[in-house]
Amino acid sequence: MNKLYWLTDLQLFASKKGVDSSKNGRDSNPKYLGAKLGDGQSTKAGQIIYRQRGNKIYPGLNVGQGKDHTLFAKTAGVVKYTKFMGDKTKVSVLPKEDNK
């Protein structure tokens, strides 16, 4: 038998059976977006009021906005949500009156 013929006629079989793999089965971590303080609740300076992607709710009086659009209180007071320009909403912090 020709040695060259024997090498070209070699057939290899799988040592492990091929198993289908699913392309599903993963999910992103929760981002915990939304209101952290409701209308009428008291807040401290620096406390997060609303976490959002984009401007769903706009900052009003005494409210700052972070680079990820998070709204936070600049001063201590009471949270107040109001509508403006028809369908838009803004949140403000009204300072507490000091009773002396």
Swiss-Prot record:
One of its GO terms (cellular component) is cytosolic large ribosomal subunit. It holds the Pfam family Ribosomal_L27. Residues 18-29 have a biased composition (Basic and acidic residues). Residues 18-39 are annotated as: Disordered. Transmembrane segments: none annotated. Disulfide bonds: none annotated. PROSITE patterns: RIBOSOMAL_L27. Residues 1-13 form a propeptide. GO terms for biological process: translation. GO terms for molecular function: structural constituent of ribosome. Keywords: Ribonucleoprotein, Ribosomal protein. The N-terminus is cleaved by ribosomal processing cysteine protease Prp. Signal peptide: none annotated. InterPro entries: Ribosomal_bL27, Ribosomal_bL27_CS. Belongs to the bacterial ribosomal protein bL27 family. NCBIfam families: L27. This is Large ribosomal subunit protein bL27.
